[in-house]
C-alpha cells in the first residue's frame, strides 16, 4: 500500500501551503513513506479528478470554509480515501495516525515489538545487577555485624 498526499504546488492560499508543509513534516518525522502528487502539474488532471471525486471532506480553511472542490492536502492509501488536513491533524494529536492512514499493523508494530523486547532484556539485566549488588551488600553488612558484636563482647569482658 502506498500513502499518497495530494498537494497543490501553485496554491495562492497561505493556509493551504502551511497545511501541506505540516502534513509532510509530520509524515517525515514519523518515518512514514509517502508519495506526493502535485495536482497542478501538467498531465495530472486524472489525479486531480480522482482526489476531487473520492474526497468526502472539502478541507475548508478560515478564508474559504465551504470550498466548491476539496482543497489539498488530501490523503489516500492507494485509492482509498483517508481524510483531509483537519482529520489528519486530529489523528496525529490523539496518536492514532497509523489507523487513520490505514497502514498495515505489521509495518508499525514490528519496530515497536523489537524495541519493547530490547527494553525488557535491558531491564532484566539491570534488575539482575541490582539484585546481585543488594546481596553483596547484605553479605558485607552481615559480616560487619558479627565483627561489631564480637568487638562489643570483648570490650564487655575487659
UniProtKB/Swiss-Prot annotation:
Segments carrying motif SH3-binding: 67-73
Domain of life, per the record?
A: Eukaryota
Q: Give the Phosphothreonine positions (modified residues).
A: 109
Residue ranges under compositional bias (Polar residues)? 52-61
Point to the regions of Basic and acidic residues compositional bias: 40-51
Q: Which InterPro entries match?
A: Glut_rich_SH3-bd, SH3BGR, Thioredoxin-like_sf
Q: Please provide one cellular component term from the Gene Ontology annotations of this protein.
A: cytoplasm
Pfam families recorded for this chain? SH3BGR
Keywords attached to this entry: Phosphoprotein, SH3-binding
The record, for CDD domains, names: GRX_SH3BGR (cd03030)
Q: Where is this region: Disordered?
A: 40-74, 118-158
Record-linked PANTHER family = SH3 DOMAIN-BINDING GLUTAMIC ACID-RICH PROTEIN HOMOLOG, SH3 DOMAIN-BINDING GLUTAMIC ACID-RICH-LIKE PROTEIN
The entry sums up its family as follows: Belongs to the SH3BGR family.
Name of the protein in question: SH3 domain-binding glutamic acid-rich protein homolog
Amino acid at each position: 500500500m502506498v500513502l499518497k498526499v495530494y498537494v497543490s504546488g501553485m496554491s495562492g492560499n497561505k493556509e493551504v501551503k502551511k497545511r501541506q508543509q505540516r502534513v509532510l513534516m509530520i509524515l517525515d518525522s514519523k518515518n512514514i513513506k509517502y508519495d506526493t502528487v502535485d495536482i497542478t502539474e501538467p498531465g495530472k488532471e486524472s489525479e486531480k479528478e480522482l482526489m476531487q471525486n473520492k474526497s468526502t471532506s472539502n478541507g475548508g480553511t478560515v478564508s474559504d470554509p465551504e470550498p466548491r472542490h476539496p482543497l489539498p492536502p488530501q490523503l489516500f492509501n492507494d485509492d482509498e480515501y483517508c481524510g483531509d488536513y483537519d482529520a489528519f491533524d486530529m489523528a496525529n494529536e490523539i496518536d492514532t495516525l497509523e489507523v487513520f492512514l490505514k497502514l498495515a499493523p505489521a509495518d508499525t508494530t514490528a519496530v515497536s515489538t523489537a524495541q519493547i523486547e530490547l527494553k525488557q532484556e535491558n531491564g532484566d539485566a539491570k534488575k539482575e545487577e541490582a539484585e546481585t549488588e543488594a546481596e553483596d551488600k547484605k553479605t558485607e553488612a552481615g559480616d560487619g555485624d558479627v565483627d561489631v558484636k564480637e568487638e562489643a563482647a570483648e570490650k564487655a569482658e575487659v
